[in-house]
């Protein structure tokens, strides 16, 4: 992969009041600041993973140092912290800014389109007559099922990417997320320090976080419609994939740490994280007592904060149980 500026890196330039010269700086994710030359500044500013560095000999001499100073990625496999790794599928180049109007249009249409497709698909499934007759031994086409499921996970992240570009986020890449060697989903990486817009409204943040859920709802509707129109041999597979998309939408809507629902709710309330706010209010003895002194309102807030923590526990247990089942089935299949 061509060099890509890391998501936690920021670039800046300052005009020296004494000399009148412009000085260029780069700061990495661990807050180390380096002064760099103008040519390197411009090369890093344009390092989006889609082309070589705009330096002599494509910057081959300086790339090892830039990697060592935690300024660029050159491998598709990146360490995201702890046991988490990402595999970059799609570097999002800077040229997407040229068609930002298209992304704005798609983002504006997505909430309504997702609802209309889902209502249409659900109506057809509940009240329509299936086209054709199911075969006697109806079964799921495994390869198609997994292909559509992985596409649905990727589509969720493309929804975030679309909203991010529309609102002026510096979207870097779309990739697959791993814990160790186990794939657990997909992700979109953004460099908020280098975003083209500095202040985002609550409405923009909420839509950014909900756009992935909306994409899955729309996908579920499309699959339900397709199961009605296409060959009945495919119907069960398409319906099962629609169910997966509905499950993804519901799961991501929950207010658990790291999920879109928690981030959207936090943006709505104007705080960094409702999960950590719940922890602070319930685990801090003085805050907890202060809440309970406010009568019904205080008890309601305590119950709300408690439900956030319970949701977090249930989501973790659900994910772990699914991986236990997956490992068990894999071992059983092998042996």
Please name every model-derived segment.
Residues 43, 156, 175, 212, ...:
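Divalent metal-coordination and catalytic microenvironments
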Residues 1-28:
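Long, low-complexity, charged/polar intrinsically disordered regions in eukaryotic proteins
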Residues 200-334:
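Hydrophobic transmembrane alpha-helical segments that form the core helix bundle
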Residues 79-83, 142-195, 267-269, 273:
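Small-residue-rich helix-interface/hinge motifs
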Residues 133-139, 192-200, 237-240, 294:
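Helix-boundary and loop/linker segments of multi-pass membrane transporters
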Residues 56-66, 84-97, 149-163, 182-192, ...:
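Hydrophobic alpha-helical transmembrane segments
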